[in-house]
Amino acid sequence: LSARVGRQVISWGESLFFQGISGAQNYADAAAANSPGTQVKEIFLPTGAAYFNLEMTPSINIEAYYQYEWKETKEAGVGSYWSNSDISGDGSERILFVVEDLGLIIPAPVTNGEDPSDNGQWGVALRYFMESGTEFGLYRLRYHDKFPSFVGVADSTATGPLARLPVQLLRHYEEGMDMYGASFSTLVGDVNIVGELSYVPNSVVTQQVLPVLDPTTGRYENGKIQDGHVTQGNLGLFYVWGKTPVADSINLLGEAVYVSTDMDEDDILNDDDAYGYALTADFNYNSVMSGVDLAVKTSFKHAVDGSWKTLTLTDSAKEGSLGLQATYLKRWKGDIKYSRFWGAKSINNKQDRDNITVTVQYSF
């Protein structure tokens, strides 16, 4: 039996570019996910937890954890470069509603509801390792939502056009969500194939920002959050191509994702199903000069159909990047990368966010 206690990232499943099972376990830096080619393991942040791993036999492991801390995903601050909402992220204060009947713009404050408990988040896993190198995993998780939902709070005294507007917008995080999952990892020739399937019977699929009219009383009531069944599948591959005429080695990584819900599309936040894929290819050049290795890094992502916020899928949106990375003596690392976003017309909030980034790292 091995154990560790403290702030840590616990990552189960096999997701690469699209959050799956591991996304329920960890809160994340959502702004970092806006950089094309970023893997989910690069955006997760550590949470306080006790983790245990028991080797039952050489081929069977049981894992379990209990989190004693809850933290929400860090979204881009309102008005910052990557922000696409005035109600979510640090600095969110109010939302403005236009009342055309009266020619007015009415502000409503955005307020925080009660945060989920630091307790009540846990998971158990059963892993089976075959002699051939194939691995299977089964998972059961209980977690609190890391992304907020919003509901409108009605003014019971208001009449006329103002009655349908909220007096405040309440930020809410759903508690006690359940996940059931399975994963596999295997080799087919020289290609590593991985995949996972997850099912959440009580995922947040709809939120009502505006108060809702009760036909029996004729009054507007607070908006509601509705749960639904959500199923998600991820399938990925990893392949290292050895010496070629164009590079000393080429690392290929790809993943496709599909997600669906049983709710009617007209009633939910996202589409009733969505799918897309992401690819990266790194061309590596060793010792181009004394102590210096170079890598040309490329990425491409395409939301083929449907939108799903937590998977950063926007219907028909595309993004890609081209970069150069230099490593000196395995300690210094410098990157320059150009990123471009296009497609999806008016619903793609990143269309005007093309950028060039330069980073320098030192390891010791």
Model-derived regions, located:
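Extracellular loop and loop/strand-boundary signature of outer-membrane beta-barrel proteins
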Residues: N34-T38, S80, G103, A108-N112, ...
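Transmembrane beta-strands of outer-membrane beta-barrel pores
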Residues: R7-S11, Y66-E72, R140-K146, V188-D190, ...
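Short loop/turn motifs that connect adjacent beta-strands in outer-membrane beta-barrel proteins
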Residues: L1-R4, W12-L16, S59-I62, E75, ...
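Outer-membrane beta-barrel "beta-signal"
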Residues: D352-F364
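Membrane-embedded beta-strand positions of outer-membrane beta-barrel proteins
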Residues: A3-V5, F52, A64, L126, ...
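Outer membrane beta-barrel
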Residues: L1-S88, D305, D315-A317, S339-G343
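Outer-membrane beta-barrel translocator domains and adjoining extracellular loop/strand segments
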Residues: S15-S22, E75-Y81, P107, S149-D155, ...
